[in-house]
Amino acid sequence: MTDVTKDIDNLADALLTMEISPEINDLMEKLALNLTSSNNLPVDVKHLLTSIKTYLTQSSSEMLDYNLLLEVLDAVVGLCPFEDVLKVFSVDDLITALKSGDKALTETVCQVIAAASPRDIFAGTPLLDEMLKLYFCESTVVAIVNALEKTLGILVTNQLNRRRILENNLPVLISVKDCKNSTTFCRFLDLIKILSASVTFEEFRKDIFIIDNMVTNKMMENDILVFIHICQYYIELLTISLTEDGKEWVIRYVKPSFEIFGEAFSRREELFDVGHFAKSYLLTLFSKISYLDDKSYIQLLEAQFFPLYPDKQYLDEFLTVLDPSYIAKVHLDLLKEKALRAGNVHMFVNLIKDEDCFVQLKDEINSKTLNDMPYIEKMLLLDGLTLTSYGIQHLTRNMPSVMNSIIDSGNQVTEKLSFDLRLRVFENLLEANPQELSVWLIPLQSEYANILNGRRGRFSSGQLADDYL
């Protein structure tokens, strides 16, 4: 009998007999680790699954760590044939558990459902319907909502599951979209955000996936949390259209909503909550719009709602987030008077992604300015600068003292962010053409080896752990 088999049997027996001791958590932690690193199960685990089910439905103990139990369950259902799982957790059992209102039991059920194989095995059952009922119930606690969202995010990658949600539950979706309850409406937004990553053009229903501008305007004026949720949803739609092949059609549906967000920004002083809580989301949304191939969208928004002129207080905020190629094409003149300082490093990092913008700004990126900067801001700028060949040429040919400071600054690395930034600068440089590095190649390689081998400028494992905590 292997150690894993023995641990499975011991855990199953303890759960079945309800004999829970403090040592059970150590047993579950060990078993979860061993199962996670394994490719197969050495024994039939229906006995363990039955014990988990029996324990969760009939008992509870403050000594038992339910998160560890879920880790064990997740590892088990990921390794055993799903038909074995269904022999223990039938569809009726899963539905009953969802209706129970019990947090631990519901999270367990979500783990089982998420492991469904084939993915659409539950599409012809009421299981997804019950999940949606529980999800949209205002009294459902956040932990269960999170578990449901995670599980639905896995299930909706399958077409039959999406059909069950979008067709069989269409009346439910329309009802919650029109409801007056902010909590329920925000959950609806989160659900369609999850769905939007997988839906096809044929499945994308405007009456479900697009929020009426009147609703957005009302939330902008009266409920800032819902308005932020709407912003996040449209940011996700724009991200999908920008990053996923074949999803460009999303733009035709979202572009009629662009103006309402421009109006929100223009009214930020009038609407206190928008100016103080939603502005960063609006800037992110405008950033996404600026990266669309058709630059007329951002150009029209700018002209109407946030014209970019030197005297505008918000100018630097937009120069920090907008596509620098758009800035280069339309507003290169705005960069003439921009001086590099620690407070606007992020703006420079964004702008120098475009070579025309870089040419306009490169005189500001000099040895004196960089060497006078705080270390982290200096490394942030260098991280951006070393991502382009023209930036590397400027650095290696025109700023020898900065190059020396990169190589010799190991002792200035005092916390993890400094370490990570410096490491990225080295990696960016060493990925460049060796001829561009010239005399700097060997010193860079030598110091990079020192970093990797822990001889200089590197933390002990304890220091790194402390920083993460």
Curated annotation (Swiss-Prot):
Q: Please state where this protein is localized.
A: Cytoplasm
| Keywords, comma-separated and alphabetical | Chaperone, Cytoplasm, DNA damage, DNA repair
Keyword Transmembrane helix in record? no
Does this UniProt record's set of keywords contain tRNA processing? no
- Stretches that traverse the bilayer: none
Q: Which residues form a coiled coil?
A: none
Cellular component per GO, a single term: cytoplasm
Coarsely, its chief localization is: cytoplasm
- Gene Ontology BP terms: DNA repair
InterPro entries in alphabetical order: HSM3_C, HSM3_N
By sequence similarity, the record places it as follows: Belongs to the proteasome subunit S5B/HSM3 family.
Role according to the record: Involved in DNA mismatch repair in slow-growing cells. Acts as a chaperone during the assembly of the 26S proteasome, specifically of the base subcomplex of the 19S regulatory complex (RC).
Protein name in UniProt? DNA mismatch repair protein HSM3
- Organism of origin is Kluyveromyces lactis (strain ATCC 8585 / CBS 2359 / DSM 70799 / NBRC 1267 / NRRL Y-1140 / WM37)
Gene this chain is encoded by: HSM3
